[in-house]
Amino acid sequence: MNTLFFTHQHQRSTKTLRLNYGLEGMKYIIQVYEGEINGRGEKEGLPTEYQYEFEQEMLKHVHDLKNEIRENGWFQRDTQEVSQTSFL
């Protein structure tokens, strides 16, 4: 599975998006996890999952999702590690 991480600064918290995609069993899947990092810690919701019969369909959707996410002001990160600014 491949993973992409995105962050978006939102007032006193950092919103996070994680895209996992690849072959799972006999299907190609994309899992989108939305989360948040704030003064109380980190949390991540259950994923939204998309299934595809063909790899090319999945890769096209990953490409479209990446473009849409970036157009909405999100930044792509290399890892899941994100520093949260202190508001003390």
Predicted regions and their residues:
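A short local loop/turn or secondary-structure capping micro-motif enriched for an aromatic residue
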Residues: 25, 38-40, 70
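Well-ordered alpha/beta subsegment
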Residues: 56-60, 64
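Short, mixed-charge low-complexity intrinsically disordered segments
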Residues: 14-21, 59, 68-88
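Acidic Ser/Thr/Pro-rich low-complexity disordered segments
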Residues: 34-46
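Short N-terminal "domain-start" leader segments
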Residues: 1-34
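A short, exposed loop/beta-hairpin motif centered on an aromatic-Gly-Thr core
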Residues: 5-7, 43-57
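DNA-binding interface regions
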Residues: 2, 31, 41, 77-79
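Short beta-strand segments and strand-loop junctions that repeat across beta-rich extracellular domains
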Residues: 33-35, 64-70
